[in-house]
Amino acid sequence: QVMLADSKKRAQEIRSRLYQLLGVAQQITFGEAAKIATWVGGQTGVRPALLLAVLTKESKLGVNVGLCNRPGDPENKSWRKVMKASRDHEPFLAITKSLGMNPDITPVSCPMYDKQGNKIGFGGALGPAQFIPSTWMGYTSKISAFTGKTPANPWDIRDAFIATALYLKNKGVASGGANAEWRAVLSFFAGSPDSTYRFYADNVLAIARGYEDDLKTLGL
C-alpha cells in the first residue's frame, strides 16, 4: 500500500510539473505535454521521450531564443536584420500574415555568437521548436494533414511537436535505434549530422532517457 501510494504521488508530481517552453502563449504541465508527445509519436513512429527532449533543449538554449524582434527592440534586432533575407524574409511574412500577426513585433530568435563575439549564422527561428521560416513552410501542409487545422502555427505546441516529429522522421530517426536518433537530432540542430555539434545530440538523448522513465511512471 505504501509503495502504491508513493508511486501515485510520484506520478502526480511528474504530471503536474511545468513543461518549460519558450515562445508559447501559455505554460502547460508535463502531463499535458506528455500526452501530446505520445499522440504525435503514435502517429509518426518517433519516440515520445525524444520529442519531449528536443523541444526542451530548443527552449533552453538560452539567450538567443525569442529575444529579437520584440516590441521596443532596436533596429539591429529586427527580423529584417537577424534573418537570412534571401531565404527567410518572404516565408516569415507569409507565416505572420496567415496567422494575423504583426511581423514587426513577433519575437524570433537572435543569431548565436562564438566566444570571441563573432556571429554564427542567422537568427529568425520561430516558436518552441525553433524552426526557421523557410523550413517551417515546407511542413505546413503536412502538419495540417495531422491536425485538420489550417494554417499550421509554429507557436502552437501541438503543431511544434508534429513539425519536430516529421523533421526527425525525414532524417531517418526510426531506422536504426540510438544511432539513427543521434544523427537525426544532430541534423535537427545543425542541418546535417555534423559531429562538431555532437554535444547537442548527446545532451538531447540524455534528457530523453530521463523522460523515458517519467513516461513509464505515467503509464504512457
Residue ranges and their predicted role:
Residues 1-7, 11-14, 18-21:
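Amphipathic alpha-helical coiled-coil segments
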Residues 19-220:
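Catalytic glycan-binding domains that act on GlcNAc-containing polysaccharides
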